[in-house]
């Protein structure tokens, strides 16, 4: 395919047009009075949303050069979403502001490399000032505030803070669609995995069809148990202790399963068998997690262990285990707290180093199961369109809350970015680097200007007053009042503001230093073939 190439100002101008088209579409959603954007979907009803990254991903422009500019801004939104989970619209607004001011100076003859150095220095100073202004988020009320601001719903704020209190900041909180119209929170304590009993005759409550084991021993192995003789010595030891047994194995079949069921029905002992969770290497890791949580040992050939030699000391223990036809929940495992902490640290380091989004998700699930449990927020709504929009809002709120717990909070509504302007202004830079600093100074005002504009106020008047206000005092665009933003619960996580600024500066600098753009040349549309004259006989 042949290529089309543009150079210097032509290349940058085309990309800037794309930046402006995407940013102008996204920035109308910023702030408490931001508008919605309707996205056409190939199937089903349109999606109505105010989520910046969702809108950015949907935009495809016909002009290849403009589309590249739009895609670079979309990348800023996606990257900010990946790191902080929120702040995608702020990142888009900042990118547009830096690009717009930067292009003016580059066109006037400034050196883009010098400008880039100035931008990087100014952003580093702004980030440092943001961190210095941070307030730690420690209690349930502060967590609820952050979530309520992001989701624009106090009820959602309560659900998220309650979920984080129950499962911890490392716990898994999933968002699912409810069957009804109400949004509700469901918490599963302990370690849960998606494997149920191998025989319904193992249940202890035939009405609920669940097996409840109090203070059980837990046999953990990656082997298949087909011959009951392999575990007979172990079963005899457990029989003497008069405690129930949970068997987690690759499978239990052959004569072993009916023998266990028969002894359960006769009341000889209480036993439940389930298949091991996961597959392949992930299965081995999950079995090791269960062993550490319960204080047991995985009976595996990798460690040179055989089932027939296993003793009661190799078994794990827990306060309670509940098994239904689809899942198993282990509550209060008897594992060594130090060993569990070490395992958690190992999984955290794996999360940081993995490049696969799927692997990261699975590692976070394992981390949550070791840390204390899983919370599920079931989202309910009257229509499918409302449900999709609400689900996106709750996902943003959850991510923002996690970011707040991690790095603290600052005044929201763009106030925090305006508050760091003095720290950036004091940087002593010269020439084009000073120009880069001034570009960042102007960009830091832009979120406040846009929030005010979306609420029907004059942005320049608001920013002028904000520059002279005390730290933390800001403009509440929802009411039109000047208030202490922290006291009013109008807050942003530091991680969100920091990531938005850093990612915006990074991509904007790349656009400013672009000298040539190569795009695919549009293929000429082939003319429709002429109709065969012999087929026109009946038309005369």
Curated annotation (Swiss-Prot):
GO terms for biological process: protein refolding. GO terms for molecular function: ATP binding; ATP-dependent protein folding chaperone; isomerase activity; unfolded protein binding. It catalyses: ATP + H2O + a folded polypeptide = ADP + phosphate + an unfolded polypeptide. It is found in: Cytoplasm. Pfam families: Cpn60_TCP1 (PF00118). It is an enzyme of class 5 (isomerase). InterPro entries: Chaperonin_Cpn60_CS (IPR018370), Cpn60/GroEL (IPR001844), Cpn60/GroEL/TCP-1 (IPR002423), GroEL-like_apical_dom_sf (IPR027409), GROEL-like_equatorial_sf (IPR027413), TCP-1-like_intermed_sf (IPR027410). One of its GO terms (cellular component) is cytoplasm. ATP binds at residues 29-32, 86-90, 413, 476-478, 492. Its EC number is 5.6.1.7. Belongs to the chaperonin (HSP60) family. Forms a cylinder of 14 subunits composed of two heptameric rings stacked back-to-back. Interacts with the co-chaperonin GroES. This is Chaperonin GroEL. It comes from Streptococcus pneumoniae (strain Hungary19A-6). The gene is groEL.
């Amino acid at each position: 395919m042949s290529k089309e190439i543009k150079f210097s100002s032509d290349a940058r101008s085309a990309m800037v047009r794309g930046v402006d088209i995407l940013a102008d579409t996204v920035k109308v959603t910023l702030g408490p009075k931001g508008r919605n954007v309707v996205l056409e979907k190939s199937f089903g009803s349109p999606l109505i949303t105010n989520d910046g990254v969702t809108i950015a991903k949907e935009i495809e422009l016909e002009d290849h050069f403009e589309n590249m500019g739009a895609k670079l801004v979309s990348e800023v939104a996606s990257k900010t979403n990946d790191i902080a989970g929120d702040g995608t619209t702020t990142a888009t607004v900042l990118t547009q502001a830096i690009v717009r001011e930067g292009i003016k100076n580059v066109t006037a003859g400034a050196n883009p490399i010098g400008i880039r150095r100035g931008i990087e220095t100014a952003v580093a100073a702004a980030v440092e000032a943001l961190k210095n202004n941070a307030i730690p988020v420690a209690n349930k009320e502060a967590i609820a505030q952050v979530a309520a601001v992001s989701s624009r719903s106090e009820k959602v704020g309560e659900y998220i803070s309650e979920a984080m209190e129950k499962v911890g900041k490392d716990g898994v909180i999933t968002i699912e669609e409810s069957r009804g119209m109400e949004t509700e929170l469901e918490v599963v304590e302990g370690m849960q995995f998606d494997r149920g009993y191998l025989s319904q005759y193992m249940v202890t409550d035939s009405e609920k069809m669940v097996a409840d084991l109090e203070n059980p021993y837990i046999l953990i192995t990656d082997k298949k148990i087909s011959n009951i003789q392999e575990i007979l010595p172990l079963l005899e030891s457990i029989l003497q202790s008069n405690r129930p047994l949970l068997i987690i194995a690759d499978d239990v079949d052959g004569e072993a399963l009916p023998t266990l069921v028969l002894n359960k029905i006769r009341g000889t002992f209480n036993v439940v068998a389930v298949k091991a969770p996961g597959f392949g290497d992930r299965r081995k890791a999950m079995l090791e997690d269960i062993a550490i949580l319960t204080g047991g040992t995985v009976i595996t050939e990798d460690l040179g262990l055989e089932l027939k030699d296993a003793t009661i000391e190799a078994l794990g223990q827990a306060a309670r285990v509940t098994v239904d036809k689809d899942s198993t929940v282990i509550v209060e495992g008897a594992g060594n707290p130090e060993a569990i902490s070490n395992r958690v640290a190992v999984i955290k380091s794996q999360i940081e180093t993995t490049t696969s989004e799927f692997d990261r998700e699975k590692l976070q699930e394992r981390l949550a199961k070791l840390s204390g449990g899983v919370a599920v927020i079931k989202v309910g709504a009257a229509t499918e369109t409302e449900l999709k929009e609400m689900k996106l809002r709750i996902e943003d709120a959850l991510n923002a809350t996690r970011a707040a717990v991690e790095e603290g909070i600052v005044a929201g509504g763009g106030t925090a970015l305006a508050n760091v302007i003095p720290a950036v202004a004091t940087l002593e830079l010269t020439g084009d680097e000073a120009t880069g600093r001034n570009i960042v100074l102007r960009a830091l005002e832009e979120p406040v200007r846009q929030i005010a504009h979306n609420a029907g106020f004059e942005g320049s008047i608001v920013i002028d007053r904000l520059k002279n206000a005390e730290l933390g005092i800001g403009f509440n665009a929802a009411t039109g009042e000047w208030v202490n933003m922290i006291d009013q619960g109008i807050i942003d996580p530091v991680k969100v503001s920091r990531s938005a600024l850093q990612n915006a500066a990074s991509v904007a600098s790349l656009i400013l230093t672009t000298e040539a753009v190569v795009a695919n040349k549009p293929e000429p549309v082939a003319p429709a073939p002429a109709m065969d004259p012999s087929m026109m006989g009946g038309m005369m």
